[in-house]
Curated annotation (Swiss-Prot):
Catalytic activity: Couples ATP hydrolysis with the unwinding of duplex DNA by translocating in the 3'-5' direction; ATP + H2O = ADP + phosphate + H(+)
GO cellular component: nucleotide-excision repair factor 3 complex; transcription factor TFIIH holo complex; transcription preinitiation complex
Name of the protein: General transcription and DNA repair factor IIH helicase/translocase subunit XPB
Pfam families: ERCC3_RAD25_C (PF16203), Helicase_C_3 (PF13625), ResIII (PF04851)
Domain Helicase C-terminal: 423-584
Organism of derivation: Enterocytozoon bieneusi (strain H348) (Microsporidian parasite)
Lineage: Eukaryota, Fungi, Fungi incertae sedis, Microsporidia, Enterocytozoonidae
Positions of short motif DEAH box: 322-325
């Protein structure tokens, strides 16, 4: 322990785990530093946990932090002497960074090598050697199709590739089409957005990497600002056609770009900006599309295939990957390596997956450049304060008796269609509609989604809902004072902007998915009313008591708890049964419902494809 240890805010464990005491005077300075060098693990109110990893140190080195700067600053804030193995890890990772650089020349790729010793080391590696086309004194030529594999191998041998794009260089100016775009004078970016962009952009160079911001905190504007700074042709990949529309609206709202320079490529809308710029072929554009449109491997129509060929032949200045956590999926990752681009920016609110592929983003996209603190943004009014509740719904005796003897799929169906859960959902909708709230009800089960919505006479959106109908329903939810509740399947988990929503009710979900829980909470974080005095949004997760739903619910909440949220448990409301017209109130209605459910040949996890 150091002599002044009681004044220092953090403790460094031998395995690189850092415990930060937020009640110390200089804790905020320490927080700002730790964000740059370590991964946030848990950030409740008083005690934060961070983990130093090779990836986090590579990211720190990528923004210019040196070995001495990291160790000296850590020692300044630490109660204890930095363990030797942690010092060695910091030294090894930061000193090896910057020795290899990925260079693009026209449509050719090279690795620039720092010195002869490293050159010999790289060329003697059997895996890397198989990817090298030919070599000169200080550079190695590689094929574009092998870039992903090479990046992965370089990380494994502790020599990560620097992947930067000098967008002011002579070759860039002449080879990549310029984009006439600026932010409008009325558009103001917030301090945390500026900090995140400074991690990516500097001295005329753009670093490929990932920015993590909560839902509703302005990820889209960060991406638009990056495009406006680089001023080169851009391709934006989204998870849905609804998201494509919202990106286009935001680009036209925040920037001075000519609307004809912004194209959409979805199943319903097939545009190519060069068709509208025939008089100025040197002018670039922005294409907004979905991962699925580019990854589809089936037969396409002539017109669609023609645009696809143009997309893959075009030299893009920047690629924006919205909801970047989906990229490690096998069908999507090939899109990243197939589209020719100079730099890429991944955006997400939840850098988590339930498989082990999230770390693949380090070589598919780049290091995490910045991650915001959810509670910080909430305290400053940038996102809404949310009251989170887990609502336990007793199962009726008849339903629970059947639940105990049925197979897994029927168990899920019975727990979702539990009459008490239906009544609780109805009660909460009526309660919050009376308070003037706009409510979203989420269900992964399409069968339950339709049953609940039709019984309660509410609109719903799920997979087969057409794009036109989706936009119409969303618009009515936003502007019509008589449409205050909307039922959504998992198609609404991401990239749907509904700032009018102030209350969320979840009746079924995808097992223990932490990411889905956070994404759904995000639907109410951007509430327009968030800066009103004493305003708070509501998030209810309805679970049938003594079923597997309770186990999965605890797993799902972990990410949000790590972000500083707390869940209170609600067992019931005293006035819930005062309404004589409550759904399934009589024993006879409940028995008929049970009979119908047991006779149906379907599973409750029937979800959108």
């Amino acid at each position: 322990m150091k002599e002044n240890s009681e004044d220092c805010p953090l403790w460094i464990n031998y395995d690189g785990l850092i415990i930060l005491e937020m009640f110390r005077e200089n804790s905020q300075q320490a927080t700002n530093f730790l964000i740059a060098i370590a991964e946030p693990i848990s950030r409740p109110e008083n005690i934060h946990e961070y983990q130093i990893t090779p990836y986090s140190l590579f990211a720190a080195a990528s923004v210019g932090l040196t070995t001495d700067q990291i160790t000296n600053t850590l020692q300044k804030f630490s109660k204890n002497i930095i363990p030797r193995n942690v010092k060695n890890l910091i030294s090894d990772c930061t000193l090896s960074y910057g020795k290899l650089k990925l260079v693009r020349q026209s449509q050719k790729f090279f690795i620039e090598v720092y010195n002869d010793k490293i050159f010999n080391f790289i060329t003697s590696d059997e895996i890397l050697k198989s990817f090298i086309v030919n070599s000169n004194i200080d550079e190695l030529k590689i094929e574009i199709t092998n870039v992903e594999k090479i990046k992965k191998r370089c990380i494994e041998i502790d020599y990560p590739l620097i992947d930067e794009y000098d967008y002011t260089a002579y070759e860039s100016v002449n080879m990549i089409k310029n984009l006439h775009i600026d932010l409008k004078p009325s558009c103001h970016i917030r301090s945390y957005q500026e900090i995140s962009l400074n991690k990516m952009l500097g001295n005329g160079r753009a670093r490929s990497g990932i920015i993590v911001l909560p839902c509703g905190s302005g990820k889209t504007l960060v991406g638009i600002t990056a495009i406006s700074t680089i001023k080169k042709s851009a391709i934006i990949l989204c998870t849905s056609a609804v998201s494509v529309e919202q990106w286009k609206q935001s680009i036209l709202l925040f920037t001075t770009i000519n609307p004809y320079s912004v194209s959409r490529f979805t199943s319903d809308c097939k545009e190519w900006f060069e068709n509208y710029n025939v008089e100025n072929t040197s002018q670039g554009g922005i294409l907004i599309t979905t991962y699925s449109m580019l990854s589809f491997s089936g037969k396409r129509s002539y017109d669609v295939q023609r645009i696809i060929n143009k997309i893959f032949a075009y030299n893009w200045g920047i690629m924006i990957l919205d909801e970047v956590h989906v990229v490690p999926a096998q069908m999507f990752r090939k899109v990243v390596s197939s589209v020719l681009h100079q730099c890429k920016l991944g955006l997400t609110a939840t850098l988590v997956r339930e498989d082990d592929k999230i770390e693949d983003l380090n070589f598919l996209i780049g290091p995490k450049l910045y991650e915001a603190n959810w509670q910080d943004l909430s305290d400053k009014g940038h996102i809404a304060k949310v009251e989170c509740s887990e609502v336990w719904c007793e199962m009726t005796a008849e339903f629970y008796r059947e639940y105990l003897i049925q197979d897994t799929s029927k168990k899920r169906l019975l727990s979702i269609m539990n009459p008490v859960k239906i009544q609780m959902c109805e009660y909460l909708i009526q309660k919050h509609e009376a308070q003037g709230d706009k409510i979203i009800v989420f269900s992964d089960s399409v069968f339950a989604l339709k049953e609940y919505a039709i019984k309660m006479k509410k609109p719903f959106i799920y997979g087969p809902t057409s794009q036109t109908e989706r936009m119409k329903i969303l618009k009515q939810f936003q502007i019509n004072s008589k449409i205050n509740t909307l039922f959504l399947s998992k198609v609404g988990d991401t990239s749907i902007d509904l700032p009018e929503a102030t209350c969320l009710i979840q009746i079924s979900s995808h097992f223990g998915s932490r990411r889905q829980e956070a994404q759904r909470l995000g639907r109410v974080l951007r509430a327009k009313k968030r800066n009103n005095p004493n305003f708070k949004a509501y998030f209810y997760s309805l679970v049938s008591k003594d079923t597997e739903e309770m186990h999965y619910s605890a797993k799902r909440q972990q990410f949000l708890i790590d972000q500083g949220y707390s869940f209170k448990t609600i067992i019931g409301f005293n006035d819930m049964y005062y309404n004589e017209t409550r759904l399934y109130k009589t024993k006879q209605e409940q028995k008929e419902l049970l009979f119908n459910l047991l006779s149906k040949n379907l599973s409750s996890d029937e979800t959108d494809k």
